């Protein structure tokens, strides 16, 4: 059965709006932690930044694996398999806890690895201090993300937004209290920032769990019943889909880490400009990220129900609408780059004049960069809704590391393109991914429709 594009767009926006807001809230939490590090000392900012980068790199893989929960629950819900959806959500929690333990052990033993990679001992010491309590945030964070996937798959993403916004406010207040030693609390420095993140993450997970436990909308999905008995079959299904998603997240994060290293080779001015421009681009990127999650749920819902025409329509609507939104951001970057960079640094300050100019140049490239990045992440979400993450991983690996990274190196160091050359290389890799993933979604749909040709034709003629 076909679904009108306007009808699908309304349903998509109802689901995506709160998810976008929750993404922005999470970004604000990260920004708050960075600002708090700067309030302690320059050394705390450098070492804490190293620890935060290490935490992000490890946790992003876990986050990708847990993303499978929402996809598979949506497919089961579409198939009206309530018991199967419940079982997958329960085992998603077990998987989240196992990943949290594994990631925490890695982070607690990361100090020798950082030293091996040539990091300054004083920065490694500060990073180790930050990572003393920060890994305790992982059980709460991954539990929250698993439950977020579950409730979003049921079409209820508003509680995720509300809890995320409250968590952002509490994160700021608790950080200030521990850094300033207010209300008789000790000044815990970097360790305190990690502690606050852990407490807030656990609080957010608890709040969402209690909401799901008490709200009547979830009565048909008793997560507590049978939670103590994990299913190996369900865990394997989650792992098979989640592993390539986690791998895709890591190769994309790795591409941007490569870009930062290239900027560092060029100099401090280029690296600082890169960080400012990337902060602006990352904020805008929260919109297609939220849309991508929502598109995955919508496509998965129809795919599980066997309504392949509606699944194709949901993917196309998401990709098309995402392209329109990112075109608007691209126009903004082209028309107002100075104003956007001026939100971060003063163009009239001689100390920042060179950084300002480079950041403006990067933002002009980001107009194309952002358009392609938005399209590729939504197309990726569409394919995952069809229970296929291997295709997205392979396309991402090829486009990011066989096109994007070599192009960035070629444009910068061989052709002398400087910082702008790195971003043109990234844009080329993302453009390759956007085209390949969009065609990949259409190819997957064509194959599925071909296999179900008799039923589909019957449904259309009816």
Swiss-Prot record:
Keywords: Antiport, Cell inner membrane, Cell membrane, Ion transport, Membrane, Transmembrane, Transmembrane helix, Transport. InterPro entries: MATE_fam, MATE_MdtK, MdtK-like. It is found in: Cell inner membrane. GO terms for cellular component: plasma membrane. One of its GO terms (molecular function) is xenobiotic transmembrane transporter activity. The chain crosses the membrane at residues 12-31, 51-73, 93-115, 125-147, 160-179, 189-211, 238-260, 275-297, 318-340, 350-372, 393-415, 419-441. GO terms for biological process: monoatomic ion transport. Pfam families: MatE (PF01554). It is a multi-pass membrane protein. Multidrug efflux pump. Belongs to the multi antimicrobial extrusion (MATE) (TC 2.A.66.1) family. This is Probable multidrug resistance protein NorM. The lineage of its organism: Bacteria, Pseudomonadati, Pseudomonadota, Gammaproteobacteria, Pseudomonadales. The gene is norM.
């Amino acid at each position: 059965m076909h679904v009108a594009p306007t009808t699908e767009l309304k349903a998509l926006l109802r689901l995506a709006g709160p998810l976008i807001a929750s993404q922005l809230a999470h970004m604000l939490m990260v920004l708050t932690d960075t600002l708090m590090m700067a309030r302690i000392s320059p050394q705390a900012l450098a070492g804490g930044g190293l620890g935060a980068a290490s935490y992000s790199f490890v946790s992003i893989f876990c986050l990708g694996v847990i993303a499978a929960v929402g996809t598979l629950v949506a497919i089961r819900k579409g198939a009206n398999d309530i018991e199967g959806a419940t079982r997958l959500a329960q085992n998603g929690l077990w998987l989240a806890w196992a990943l949290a333990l594994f990631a925490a052990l890695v982070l607690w033993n990361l100090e020798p690895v950082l030293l091996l990679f040539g990091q300054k001992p004083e920065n490694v010491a500060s990073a180790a201090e930050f990572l003393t309590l920060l890994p305790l945030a992982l059980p709460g964070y991954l539990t929250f993300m698993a439950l977020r996937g579950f409730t979003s798959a049921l079409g209820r993403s508003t509680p995720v937004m509300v809890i995320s916004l409250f968590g952002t406010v509490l994160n700021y207040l608790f950080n200030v209290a521990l850094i300033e030693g207010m209300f008789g609390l000790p000044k815990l420095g970097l360790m305190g920032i990690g502690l606050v993140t852990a407490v807030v993450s656990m609080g957010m997970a608890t709040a969402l769990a209690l909401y799901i436990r008490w709200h009547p909308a979830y009565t048909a999905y008793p997560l507590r019943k049978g939670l103590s008995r994990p299913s190996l079959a369900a865990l394997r299904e989650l792992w098979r889909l989640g592993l390539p998603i986690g791998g895709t997240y890591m190769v994309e994060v790795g591409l941007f880490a490569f870009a930062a290293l290239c900027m560092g080779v060029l100099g401090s001015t280029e690296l600082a400009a890169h960080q400012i421009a990337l902060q602006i681009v990352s904020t805008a990127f929260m919109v297609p990220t939220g849309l991508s999650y929502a598109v995955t749920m919508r496509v998965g819902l129809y795919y599980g129900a066997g309504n392949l025409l509606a699944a194709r329509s949901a993917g196309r609507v998401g990709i098309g609408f995402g392209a329109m939104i990112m075109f608007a951001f691209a126009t903004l970057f082209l028309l107002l780059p100075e104003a956007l960079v001026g939100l971060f640094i003063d163009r009239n300050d001689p100390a920042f004049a060179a950084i300002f100019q480079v950041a403006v140049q990067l933002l002009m490239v980001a107009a194309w960069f952002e358009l392609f990045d938005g399209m590729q992440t939504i197309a990726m979400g569409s394919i995952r809704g069809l229970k296929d993450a291997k295709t997205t991983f392979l396309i991402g690996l090829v486009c990011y590391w066989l096109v994007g990274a070599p192009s960035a190196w070629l444009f910068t160091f061989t052709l002398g393109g400087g910082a702008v050359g790195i971003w043109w290389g990234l844009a080329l890799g993302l453009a390759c991914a956007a085209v390949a993933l969009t065609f990949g979604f259409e190819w997957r749909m064509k194959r599925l429709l071909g296999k179900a040709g008799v039923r589909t034709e019957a449904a259309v003629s009816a």
